[in-house]
UniProtKB/Swiss-Prot annotation:
Signal peptide: none annotated. It comes from the Eukaryota. The gene is cia1. Histone chaperone that facilitates histone deposition and histone exchange and removal during nucleosome assembly and disassembly. GO terms for biological process: chromatin organization; DNA replication-dependent chromatin assembly; nucleosome assembly; nucleosome disassembly; transcription initiation-coupled chromatin remodeling. This is Histone chaperone cia1. InterPro entries: ASF1-like, ASF1-like_sf, Hist_deposition_Asf1.
Length: 262
């Protein structure tokens, strides 16, 4: 996954005349701040046999780039027919390449097929030799971009953040959600166990209540509380008695006089 990702590309004027400029509405997403601008470029492939006939129709620097979703319109000039091997090479199918680079490093390229046809001429019924003999009138040539089927190629580059990982994004807090779900399940199990224990205790109390009468229940409760209080009182009394015994023992013990040497 790249820091900059193209979300959509809309061809605004399609079909159009060969001499009309290209117009693209580009929407992309930026995940982190960028120090430099993005360089967008549109290239026209003038010949299928040699890259020397490729034409850079236009370049555009876009920046500064804020984090989030951004949209702009990229307009590029039409190809220069004087730079083509032959004028007849205008006709037929060719390719345009929309690319983006960061600090001279290309990281994405979108390719489109383009079909150029001249009015009153059916190229499908002609072979290559016949097409090369056609006297081309640029004012009658129309282009049609196959915008529905772009070919996207991505390249890994070094961004500003050296710690940025191009691997697919990990779902945030996935482990925490699993831990929370497990904790909730454990709490539910503990609650169910606690309710079961309470029910068992209530059943035991109910059995005891059934064996005795109401007066007996009240007497038992009172005795239990009195016994607890008595136990506490006995402990305090024992502590007081032990303290008094120690004090009386200290008083009864005669003082030892130090021996004197004669």
């Amino acid at each position: 996954m790249s820091i900059v990702n193209i979300l959509s590309v809309n061809v605004l004027n399609n079909p159009a005349k060969f001499s009309d400029p290209y117009k693209f509405e580009i929407t992309f997403e930026c995940l982190e701040p960028l120090k430099s601008d993005l360089e967008w470029k549109l290239t026209y492939v003038g010949s299928a046999t040699s890259q020397s006939y490729d034409q850079i129709l236009d370049t555009l620097l876009v920046g500064p780039i804020p984090i989030g979703i951004n949209k702009f319109v990229f307009e590029a000039d039409p190809p220069n027919i004087d730079l083509l091997p032959q004028l007849s090479d205008v006709l037929g199918v060719t390719v345009i390449l929309l690319s983006c680079a960061y600090e001279d490093n290309e990281f994405v390229r979108v390719g489109y097929y383009v079909n150029n046809e001249m009015e009153g001429l059916n190229l499908q019924e002609m072979d290559d030799a016949e097409i090369k003999k056609v006297k081309v009138d640029i004012s009658k040539v129309w282009r049609s971009i196959l915008a529905e089927k772009p070919r996207v190629t991505r390249f890994n580059i070094q961004w500003d953040n050296p710690d940025f990982d191009d691997a697919p994004p990990v779902q945030p807090d996935a482990d925490e959600e699993e831990e929370e779900e497990e904790a909730d399940e454990m709490e539910e199990e503990f609650d169910e166990e606690g309710e079961g224990d309470e029910e068992e205790e209530e059943e035991d109390d109910g059995d005891g209540d059934g064996e005795g009468d109401g007066d007996g229940e009240g007497e038992n409760d009172g005795k239990g509380s009195e016994e607890e209080e008595e136990e506490e009182i006995d402990i305090e009394e024992e502590e007081e008695e032990s303290a008094l015994a120690n004090a009386s023992a200290a008083e009864e013990k005669p003082e030892e006089k130090p021996e004197t040497s004669q």
